[in-house]
Amino acid sequence: DCPPDWSSYEGSCYRVFEQKMNWEDAEKFCTQQQTGGHLVSFQSSEEADFVVSLTSPILRDSFVWTGLSDVWKGCRFEWSDGSDLSYKDNYQFVFSEYECVASKTKNNKWRIIPCTKLEYFVCEFQA
């Protein structure tokens, strides 16, 4: 079961936060919300669709941080919760000067943007 204000899907709990933070602060905020909490990670297109169903009505057409980043500058993107990057939403990773991945609230299109940008975000933890 998920706490009040959190939504349940496939054994995880999710919550949209209508405040903007940079990637690092948002990830830290998520870890402080619940044990095992992180910025959202996607393991399937169904999970991504579920998150879109949460974010789109609240945030309309904007971006949310995901837990995906290359903050260690290792030329390898990783989820902040340590899960496998098996689902990529057909995303072609072009390595740029930016390191953090945000997701479009309307359609889950990913974009690599500067980690210092202020964006809304979704936290997730295992129920």
Curated annotation (Swiss-Prot):
Gene3D superfamilies: Mannose-Binding Protein A, subunit A (3.10.100.10). One of its GO terms (cellular component) is extracellular region. It holds the Pfam family Lectin_C. Keywords: Blood coagulation cascade inhibiting toxin, Disulfide bond, Hemostasis impairing toxin, Platelet aggregation inhibiting toxin, Secreted, Toxin. One of its GO terms (molecular function) is toxin activity. It is found in: Secreted. Expressed by the venom gland. Residues 9-124 form the C-type lectin domain. Disulfide bonds join C2-C13, C30-C123, C100-C115. PANTHER family: MANNOSE, PHOSPHOLIPASE, LECTIN RECEPTOR RELATED. Thrombin and prothrombin (F2) inhibitor. The IC(50) of thrombin-induced platelet aggregation and fibrinocoagulation is 62 and 35 nM, respectively. Its inhibitory activity is at least 10-fold lower than that observed for other thrombin inhibitors. Belongs to the snaclec family. Heterodimer of subunits alpha and beta; disulfide-linked. This is Snaclec bothroinsularin subunit beta. It comes from Bothrops insularis (Golden lancehead).
